[in-house]
Amino acid sequence: FDGDGDLDVLVQGQVDLTPFVLLYIENQSMDLYGTADSLKYRLVNPCWGHVREYISQTGWTEFVCDTGRAANQRLRHGGTTLTSLDLNNDGIVDLLTGDSYNPYLRSLVNVMDNVDAEIDLTLSDTTFPVYNQPAILPNIPAAYIEDVDGDGINDMLVAPNQLTDGATSFFDTSITKEVDWYYRNTGSNLNPNFELESAGFFSGEMIDVGARSFPAMVDLNGDQLLDLVLGNEGYTIY
């Protein structure tokens, strides 16, 4: 994040029952040893972006950070995915987030700098990418930035990070079908424009009947050839 060559960490955390905040934890390897091969971390910004998240449909809100957290207070993760990238070609890291309570990706646009960040929610989308087909995936969706088609420009893959969302039946795996979305970047790495190419990037080339699927081979029609029967846990049989 600070451009010195070692890997820093941005993580969501919670202190006791307070709303979830973003914590910037800086790797001190280059500062202390002159190399990027060590993991020596220090909490630098306990409220990165000056935003917090309630576990409800209200999502992210802006706030003034209280930096007086006691060092021994326990941090808890909030079931949120974070993907860092520059969304608007200003050279500053922005975020894409996914949550356990919402099937959409959200963008958080940073208007300050990478370390002392300031998220402007008026520039942020609650259904990303709002200019194309928004990603709608249950169970903590996450964005993965990779050059999928080999053109030197990073594309976006979106997939869930949990099998069930708790609201539906644990055994209803129908919502796990076609949950690997591929967005091609028709813009650039610094100013991306993601357009949906496929809602089944991997599963479109497979027999997709959802999670916990099991095959059975049996001759169903007596032609002495094995047929394929597929079922998944508690949903249906094919």
List the predicted regions and their residue ranges:
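Beta-propeller-forming repeat regions
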Residues: 1-238
